[in-house]
Each structure stands twice: as C-alpha cells, then as structure tokens.
C-alpha cells in the first residue's frame, strides 16, 4: 500500500487553505498544518487560521494546539508531525495532506534537522528577557562574535532565529554552524510537494486586502488581549509587533496597517526565494 505525504506549500495569502481542504476531501485525509504561527492559541485573526466551516469540513492538526506562552521549535514540530504522519498511515491512509508556509517546519519534515544539543529553558528565558531590555541588535552582535558564519547566513532581525543560535552556542560552547551537517534523514513514506503561485501583483493585492480584513475582524482587540504576553516567542511576528507599536502610541493605526502589509509582502518574497531553489516542487498557478 502506498504511503504518500502531499505537501501543499506557497507564499502567504496565495490560497493554500482552500486548495488543501479540497485535496483533503478528495483523498479522505485530514489536513496537517505546517504553520509556525497558526499552531499557537489565541492568535486566530493575525495568523489567518482556517475558517470555522473549513475546520468543520476536514479535521485539522496543529491548529491552535500550543499555548502562546510556550516556546516551540521546528525540532519539536518534526518529532510530533512525523509521529502523527506515521500513525495516520498505519491507520490505513494512503495519501495525507500537509499544508503551510513555514519553510523550516517543512524542511524539518522532509529532511530532518541536524542533531542540535538539548536546549536550556532557563538560559532561553534569560535571552528573551535580554531581548526586551537590550534589543535584538545586541544579541546579534554577541552571535557574530561566537559564530560569524551563522551570523552571515540568518536574518539577524529575526529575534527567534538569533536567540536559538545563541542559545546553542552558549549551551554547547561550540558555534551553532558546527552542528549543521546537511545530512538528510530517511522517511518511511513518499513525499510530493505542490507549490501554489499567483502573479506577483495579484498576490500582493490579496495580502493587502487580507490585512484590511484582519483589522475589520478585530485584530487590534486580539493583540490587546495578548499584551501581557508580548515578550513571548510566539508574538515576535508580523501582525503583532506592529499593533503592539500602535497600542504603545508610537505609531498611528494607519501606519501599523501599512507596515503589516509591507512586512507580509517581504515575507512572501522570502518564501518564494527559498522554495524556487527546490527542484522537487511542482508549481501550480491558482
């Protein structure tokens, strides 16, 4: 019996949710979400979780399953998602549908992650506290001194990536880059990847409109309810950081909306750049 994992990927707002629900219904599969933001609770508007009707039509996994206060890594996702996939195949599924736009999560499922040392929760909490007081630039500079290679390769504005790399350096006494072997981990199932794409102007228009819809649906109120947790890892992301700035009265709402739209477009471009290097993806215009 065949065991095929169909991964539907693509930039934010391209239409992955509708496409994946359709495929899941076709194959009698649940939808396994591969989204590093939708996995957190209490962030439904800003992460564009599937609608109530979509969630009712098909069973979804990894949607709002982790508390916003909990640190959750691509390594955690690899362990849980691969175990789930294996169990569902053992239950008789021949094709499973996975969908998302998180590059590191998808790569973790397809190729496995390098064997990094165990994390240190106390050290991680200390680094996040320092982030709030000193800013990401100070931590990035510390990473540069300990691991120039990783510093040159990652987005040093991404506080989560900087903190994870720095944590590994401090725990192990070795550069984060020294653990990256690039060896692929074998899987007991076939993987097929479908990438969804649209003309750039159409995609950007959809992104801009989605942000406006989020505001109408209550994004500001959602972010306000999360103010006590603003320093948590889950909230260091587009759509939340900008509204926090608005709630701090540092920028007007119109500017926050503009920044969310711009930063989301930049993220979509980064996603496409990453995946265009993968020859195994079959691209589909939607």
Give the positions of each predicted feature:
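Phosphate/pyrophosphate-binding catalytic cores of soluble transferases and nucleic-acid-acting enzymes
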Residues: 1-286
């Amino acid at each position: 019996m065949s065991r095929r994992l169909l991964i539907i990927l693509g930039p934010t707002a391209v239409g992955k949710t509708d496409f994946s629900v359709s495929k899941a219904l076709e194959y009698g599969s649940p939808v396994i979400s591969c989204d590093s933001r939708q996995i957190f609770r209490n962030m439904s508007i800003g992460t564009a979780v599937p609608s109530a009707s979509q969630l009712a039509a098909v069973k979804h996994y990894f949607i709002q399953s982790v508390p916003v206060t909990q640190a959750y890594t691509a390594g955690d996702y690899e362990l849980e998602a691969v175990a789930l996939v294996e169990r569902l195949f053992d239950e008789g599924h021949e094709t499973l549908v996975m969908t998302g736009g998180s590059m590191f999560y998808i790569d973790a499922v397809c190729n496995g992650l390098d064997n990094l040392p165990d994390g240190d929760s106390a050290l991680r909490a200390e680094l996040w506290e320092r982030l709030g007081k000193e800013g990401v630039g100070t931590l990035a500079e510390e990473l540069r001194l300990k691991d120039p290679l990783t510093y040159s390769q990652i987005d040093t504005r991404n506080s989560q990536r900087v903190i994870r790399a720095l944590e590994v350096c401090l725990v192990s006494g070795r550069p984060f880059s020294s653990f990256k072997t690039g060896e692929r981990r074998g899987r007991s199932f076939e993987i097929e990847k479908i990438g969804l794409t649209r003309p750039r102007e159409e995609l950007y228009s959809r992104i801009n409109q989605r942000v406006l819809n989020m505001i109408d649906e209550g994004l500001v109120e959602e972010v306000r309810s999360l103010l006590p947790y603003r320093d948590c890892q889950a909230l260091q992301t587009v759509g939340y950081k900008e509204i926090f700035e608005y709630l701090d009265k540092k920028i007007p709402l119109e500017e926050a909306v503009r920044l969310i739209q711009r930063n989301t477009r930049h993220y979509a471009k980064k996603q496409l750049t990453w995946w265009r290097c993968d020859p195994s993806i079959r691209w589909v215009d939607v």
